[in-house]
Amino acid sequence: MTEFTHINQQGHAKMVDVSDKQITKRTAVAHSSITVNETIYKQISNNTNTKGNVLNTAQIAGIMAAKNTSTIIPMCHPLPLTGIDVHFSWDETNAPLYTLNIQTTVSTTGKTGVEMEALTAASATALTIYDMTKAVDKGMIIGETYLESKSGGKSGDFQRQSGQ
């Protein structure tokens, strides 16, 4: 029978005890995206959105989300994050639709990984872009959100293969 790590003997939720795990450097990289129309693309690129600088605000939202992951995802450990970075790149190959790729990198030196923090940062970044531009078009599409890579920890390294 499978032993559930987040369920105690009484069948109730619990946070995994990581006291005996080794402290190691851990890094996770996550990806998300949002596809927008040409008007929104131009507003973001030219910094002319009436709500302000969309990318700067979205970066801050992603950083805040990573820092607060344990408050919104049950059983996530609160972690002392040592680095959070949010990068953007446009894919203009399907104009008049434009996809903004979001890559988040989160690091810590600790006893548990930062995959959830990187994924939460990527998600919140995309959601913030949607929120700041929805007055122009509510038809935007938030794309797949996934872990690109992780390093450190007992389970070792992970690198997503293309097509995976």
Swiss-Prot record:
It comes from the Bacteria. The keyword rRNA processing does not apply. Transmembrane segments: none annotated. The active site is at 131. Catalyzes the conversion of (8S)-3',8-cyclo-7,8-dihydroguanosine 5'-triphosphate to cyclic pyranopterin monophosphate (cPMP). Belongs to the MoaC family. This is Cyclic pyranopterin monophosphate synthase. It comes from Staphylococcus aureus (strain bovine RF122 / ET3-1). The gene is moaC.
